[in-house]
Every structure is written in C-alpha cells, then in structure tokens.
Regions:
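Short, well-ordered beta-strand elements
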Residues: 25-34, 53-58, 81-82, 129, ...
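Hinge/lid segment of periplasmic solute-binding proteins
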Residues: 86-137, 162-164, 179, 191-194, ...
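Glycine-centered hinge/linker elements that transmit conformational signals in sensory
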Residues: 166-169, 210-241, 282-286
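Short, solvent-exposed loop/beta-turn-alpha elements that line the ligand-binding surface or hinge
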Residues: 100-114, 184-187, 202-222, 271-276, ...
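Extracytoplasmic "Venus flytrap"/periplasmic binding protein-like
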Residues: 46-117, 121-123, 129, 149-151, ...
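Conserved C-terminal helix/tail region of periplasmic/extracytoplasmic solute-binding proteins
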Residues: 49-50, 54, 148, 372-437
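Periplasmic solute-binding protein
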Residues: 90-98, 117-155, 183-209, 297-306, ...
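C-terminal lobe and pocket-closing loops
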Residues: 264-277, 289-399
Length: 437
C-alpha cells in the first residue's frame, strides 16, 4: 500500500494532477490482451480512485489492436488518449507528428533508468515518443521432464535441425502432446515475428541492398519449407489460428514439448498460479541454422499518446504511473515477482525479489541487450529491424506474406506458390512506393 500511495502521489504531483487541482477526466486506452496489460488494467482501479479520473479500456487481440490504432492515428480519428504500440510504430509515427512527445514526465521518472537500446528505439530527433511497458526477445522454452524421459539433452545453442529431431521424438498425438508449438496465425506481428527470425537464421533477408525483395530466394524456401513440415507434422491441429496467447495456453497446460516465442511469456509459464508445468520447464536460446544473426527478435510494447488527444496531461499522468519503478514493485507485491513487466528498467534487474523469483531474468536481459537491428542476418541489408523492416510499408507487406505462408501451412497452396505470390506482390508494392528504381 505504501508503494501504491507513493506511485500515485508521484504521478499526480509531477504533472499537477492531484485531485482538486484539475477536473477529473475520462480517458480511453487501447491495449493488447496480453497478460502484462491485463494486470495493468486490474491495478489501474487504484489510480482511478486516487485521481478521480476514469479509464475506458479497449482491450483487443493483437492483430485487431494494430488495425484499430493504425486506422485511428492515420485518419486522426481521436478515439484514444493512450495507445499500446510496438517498437515498430513508435519511431515511424513520431516522425510523422502523429504522437505527442513524452519526455516531460518529471525528473523523478528517472529516464536514465530505462534500458538504453529500448529508449533509443522510441526516440526520434532527440524526442521520446513512447515509454516502454515491457520488452522482450525470443527464446526456446521446453519441458525438461519430457526431455529427461526421452533421454534427450537440450544444448545451450540448438539448431533448427536438432529442434526437428527433438520434436519428432517428443510428439505423442494420442496424448495431445505436440513436439513443437509455433505461431501460425497470419500477421506481420504474429506468424511473421517468428518467421522473420527463422528466415534470418537460415541466412535469408527481406530485401537486397537495392530494395529488391528476396522472398523466393533459397534461404526463404528452405526456412518456410522446414517451418511447414515442422509444425504440420509435430504441431497441434489448427495451428493457423494460434498466435502468442494461444500457444502460451497450450504450453502452460502441458500440450507442447517445445515453444519458440517471446521471453515475456516466462513470467506466466513459470508462475504456478497460471501454469500447470511451472516446475517442469527450462529455457535456452532461439535456434540457429546458417547464422545466429537475427535469430532472436527484439520487441517492445509501449504506451504512447496520440497527438489528437485533448487530455494529454491526464494521459501523461497515467503513463508515468504505469511505467515507473514503483509500479514494478507494486506488481511484484500484488501479483508475484515473477509477473513484473520485464525488459524496461535497469532497476528491475537489481531487485533481489525479482532475481530470486525469475531464474530467466539475466538470460532475458542479455537477449534483449544483444539483439542488433542493424545486422539482422548474414548478408548486408538496407533496413533496420530484426523481425520487421522499419519502413511504413512493412505493416501491409508483412501481413500479406504472413497470409500466404499461413495458406501454405493449411495445405491450401505449396510453399513455392506462396513465396512466388509474396515476391510478386511485394515487388509491386516496393516499386510503387519508390524503393525500386
């Protein structure tokens, strides 16, 4: 309770928003239906009570959220006062003037405590356009009990060839036990988040140095062929409907021997209140193939204020509250230390309670800090971004490619047909946008 009062007082005083100094307002927040955000929604009732302000929550599935907030910000619709956006959108939208700067939350916010690579990725021309709520890389989670029973040992750095061997040995569909769970739901931030890293590991790239698409190149063909075979033979039925949340549920309920996905999942699958296998799991690095470059992604979910908001001061008060050092401690005390938002503040990793509760903490931190968006694969590229390409056109391009690959996974077309369709469309898009001369 002391932490709660301190955090509320700090966020209100720093922005002149203590009850009685400003009229109470209603604000609308659009966010994703991930576990960390559900906790934020739950705890925000205390912020409402203390400040008198009210929150209208719009909590959406990941693909739907992206569509809604992108449409709203591009059309200046003004539906939202706070948006949950990724490390892809923040610098692009900030540069467009679509977001309000958020580098004025007060000295006590301690901007220096934010992890530098994450803060830098949200900054354009010296202005911060979003504050990180949690950050993630990707890694391989696996069932150590199943590995032990099968006489298998997971190496510190697995290859995709080894992952395929393990998946074959650990699949028992009669028990609904699948060797591997991977994202199959189409979307630039769903199946393509994972596939971007897999293609990188196979030595592939989105574009050559002249911005010509490389989607029908041999590395892409090999990576996607292996993905379709791996998930088709050893994954759950209906994998094309499974994104992050669906696979997290499958893993936490004991249906996946391995799961390659976001490091942020660790806080839930290691929590015995949310996971049936919390004491049976371990983790290691994401698999590699031809190279380790770009084999683990880099992603942040962030809170930002659209430039159209008429309630920016109240919105900033909430941002300060929800992304502060004291909020991290409040989550630890109320929800368990394993559940605190990862990857945003240096101080989180110095907390003895977090170090004790989260055996994955140091591994996750190093994965986040070591991701290099400027060198995402074996060969040179004209873009930055590990699992995405940091250009405005990528949202549409990535989703189209994801849809083609999802259709191949469903058996509706061959991998070659999917990649040829993707190559043709993306080449057309990049020519129209002026990248290809």
């Amino acid at each position: 309770m002391r932490i709660l009062l301190r955090i509320l007082s700090s966020s209100a005083v720093g922005l002149g928003l203590l009850t009685g100094l400003a009229q109470a307002e209603d604000i609308s927040i659009a966010t994703v239906n991930n576990g960390d955000m559900i906790i934020m929604q739950k705890l925000s009732a205390a912020w409402e009570k203390e400040t008198g302000n009210k929150i209208n929550w719009i909590v959406l599935e990941e693909n739907v959220l992206r569509e809604r907030v992108t449409t709203d910000i591009a059309t200046k619709g003004g539906q939202f006062d706070i948006m949950t956006i990724g490390g892809y959108e923040a610098p692009i939208w900030g540069k467009q003037g679509w977001l309000a700067p958020v580098d004025d939350l007060g000295d006590d916010y301690d901007y220096a405590d934010l992890l530098e690579p994450i803060k830098a990725g949200l900054t354009v021309d010296g202005k911060l356009y979003a504050v990180p709520f949690y950050t993630e890389s990707s890694f391989t989670l696996y069932r150590k009990d199943l590995f032990d029973a099968a006489g298998l040992t997971m190496p510190d750095q697995p290859t995709y060839e080894q992952i395929k061997e393990y998946a074959a040995k650990l699949t028992d569909k009669s028990k609904q036990q699948y060797g591997i769970c991977l994202r199959g739901k189409p979307g630039w931030g769903e199946n393509m988040a994972f596939l971007g890293t897999m293609v990188n590991a196979y030595g592939g790239r989105w574009f050559d140095m002249d911005w010509k698409p490389q989607l029908n190149s041999e590395p892409w063909k090999k990576a996607i062929t292996d993905y379709v075979a791996l998930l088709g033979e050893y994954g759950p039925q209906g994998a094309t409907a499974n994104g992050f949340n669906e696979n997290q549920t499958l893993f936490a309920t004991g249906h996946c021997a391995m799961w390659i996905d976001a490091t942020s999942a660790a806080g839930r699958v290691y929590d015995p209140k949310q996971s049936q296998v919390a004491d049976k799991i371990a983790f290691t690095r994401s698999p590699i193939a031809e190279t380790a470059n770009g084999s683990s992604w880099s992603w942040s979910w962030n809170l930002a204020i659209p430039a159209t908001s008429q309630k920016a001061d109240v919105a900033k008060s909430f941002l300060k509250w929800a992304t502060s050092k004291d909020y991290v401690k409040m989550v630890g005390e109320s929800e368990g230390w394993v559940a605190v938002p990862p990857g945003t503040r240096k101080s989180t990793y110095a907390l003895p309670e977090y170090q004790k509760a989260a055996p994955f903490a140091e591994t996750v931190l190093q994965a986040i800090l070591s991701a290099d968006p400027s060198k995402p694969t074996k060969d040179p590229v004209p873009y930055t971004g590990v699992q995405f390409v940091a250009i405005p056109e990528f949202q549409a391009i990535g989703t189209f490619v994801g849809q083609q690959i999802s259709a191949a996974l469903a058996g509706q077309q061959t991998v070659d047909a999917a990649l040829e369709a993707a190559q043709t469309q993306v080449e057309r898009d990049m020519t129209r946008a002026g990248y290809i001369k």
